[in-house]
């Protein structure tokens, strides 16, 4: 009987994962190292209505996906990434929103001896509140200290653990004494599967502005290379036309050859003072209507004031 129950459970699991893969076009492959059952329950509750979390044995997940490749060949891209303690988070919502919800459900954790550090740990300069008898403990870790008012004070920030290092017993003890919980554990997104495409989670950080900036940089680079090698493209042709016009204009100035657009430049070079004299005249012409309008406004104002005064005297006569 237990074997039949186990077989039924496996069959239901296969049906569930296949149904989720069919119903949801997007999912995360997430790492679940150091995530306890209580934290997993909290994550499921926070994602309720927006995403579905599915964990399981890697062999069962691979078997279910391989059995469904005929109907959806794109699922084969998931297989190489199902290794280690991983699971799926299926969703139809915005991937960035779900990613942020997963990050919000990380919980701080104390350093344990023998654990692999997921991040760098730095102990800040501070008064530890510990007595002088602990000085040798800090010296063994290479931390510079002094005694201040009967307690140990760390003089400068100290990088205690590097990313990927194994946490030693001394480091773990020190962090616990200082009440520092340097790590945070939760579901870590390892890969993103989106409508048949699979990519790194860093892609979610790329904004439209960043894409626009990179595109413009690419266009500038293409235009620069094409100008240097003389190969015309849509990006380089406007620059080629402008550069060509400048060369023709320079040639026209140095020779007797002329054309309508070059005549004004030649005239300016021949007599710059004529253009200098024309500038104040143009400015005066523009300013004259404005100056004429100003007295008219003053006159109108004076007339208005006079009529107001007449009206006032008439009322009190």
Curated annotation (Swiss-Prot):
UniProt xrefs under InterPro entries: Ribosomal_protein_uL10 (IPR050323), Ribosomal_uL10 (IPR001790), Ribosomal_uL10-like_insert (IPR040637), Ribosomal_uL10-like_insert_sf (IPR043164), Ribosomal_uL10-like_sf (IPR043141), uL10_eukaryotes (IPR030670)
Gene Ontology biological process terms, A to Z: cellular response to cAMP; cellular response to interleukin-4; cellular response to phorbol 13-acetate 12-myristate; cellular response to Thyroid stimulating hormone; cytoplasmic translation; lactation; response to selenium ion; ribosome biogenesis
Modified residues annotated as Phosphoserine in this record: 304, 307
Cellular localization per UniProt: Nucleus; Cytoplasm
Cross-link (Glycyl lysine isopeptide (Lys-Gly) (interchain with G-Cter in SUMO1)): 297
Processing after translation: Ubiquitinated at Lys-264 by RNF14 and RNF25 in response to ribosome collisions (ribosome stalling).
Organism (species): Rattus norvegicus (Rat)
Highest taxon above the source species: Eukaryota
Acidic residues biased stretches: 302-311
Sites bearing Phosphotyrosine, chain numbering: 24
Cystine residue pairs: none
Keyword Magnesium listed: no
The protein's name in its UniProt record: Large ribosomal subunit protein uL10
Pfam families recorded: Ribosomal_60s, Ribosomal_L10, RL10P_insert
Residue ranges, annotated region (Disordered): 294-317
Subunit structure comment from the entry: P0 forms a pentameric complex by interaction with dimers of P1 and P2. Identified in a IGF2BP1-dependent mRNP granule complex containing untranslated mRNAs. Interacts with APEX1. Interacts with FMR1.
Gene Ontology CC: cytoplasm; cytoplasmic ribonucleoprotein granule; cytosolic large ribosomal subunit; cytosolic ribosome; dendrite; nucleus; postsynapse; postsynaptic density
Record-linked PANTHER family: 60S ACIDIC RIBOSOMAL PROTEIN P0, LARGE RIBOSOMAL SUBUNIT PROTEIN UL10
UniProt keywords, alphabetically: Cytoplasm, Isopeptide bond, Nucleus, Phosphoprotein, Ribonucleoprotein, Ribosomal protein, Ubl conjugation
Covalent link (Glycyl lysine isopeptide (Lys-Gly) (interchain with G-Cter in SUMO2)) residue numbers: 297
Annotated function: Ribosomal protein P0 is the functional equivalent of E.coli protein L10.
Location in chain, cross-link Glycyl lysine isopeptide (Lys-Gly) (interchain with G-Cter in ubiquitin): 264
Residues recorded with modification Phosphothreonine: 59
């Amino acid at each position: 009987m237990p074997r039949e129950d186990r077989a039924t459970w496996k069959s239901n699991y296969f049906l569930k994962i296949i149904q989720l893969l069919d119903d949801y076009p997007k999912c995360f492959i997430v790492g679940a190292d150091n995530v306890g059952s209580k934290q997993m329950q909290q994550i499921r509750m926070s994602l309720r209505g927006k995403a579905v979390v599915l964990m399981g044995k890697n062999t069962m997940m691979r078997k279910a996906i391989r059995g469904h490749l005929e109907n959806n060949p794109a699922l084969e891209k998931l297989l190489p990434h199902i290794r280690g303690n991983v699971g799926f988070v299926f969703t139809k919502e915005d991937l960035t929103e779900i990613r942020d919800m997963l990050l919000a459900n990380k919980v701080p954790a104390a350093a344990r001896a023998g654990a692999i550090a997921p991040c760098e740990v730095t102990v800040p300069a501070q008064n530890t509140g510990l007595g002088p008898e602990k000085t040798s403990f800090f010296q063994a870790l290479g931390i510079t200290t002094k005694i201040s008012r009967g307690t140990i004070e760390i003089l400068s920030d100290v990088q205690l653990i590097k990313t990927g290092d194994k946490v030693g017993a001394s480091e773990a003890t020190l962090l616990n004494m200082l009440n520092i919980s340097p790590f945070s554990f939760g579901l870590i997104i390892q890969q993103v599967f989106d409508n048949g495409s699979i990519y790194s989670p860093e892609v979610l950080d790329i904004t439209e502005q960043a894409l626009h900036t990179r595109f413009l940089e690419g266009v500038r680079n293409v235009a620069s290379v094409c100008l240097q090698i003389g190969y015309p493209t849509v990006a380089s042709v406007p620059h080629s036309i402008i550069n060509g016009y400048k060369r023709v204009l320079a040639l026209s100035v140095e020779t007797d050859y002329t054309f309508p657009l070059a005549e004004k430049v030649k005239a300016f070079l021949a007599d710059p003072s004529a253009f200098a004299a024309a500038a104040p005249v143009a400015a005066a012409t523009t300013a004259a209507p404005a100056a004429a309008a100003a007295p008219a406004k003053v006159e109108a104002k004076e007339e208005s004031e006079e009529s107001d005064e007449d009206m006032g005297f008439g009322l009190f006569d």
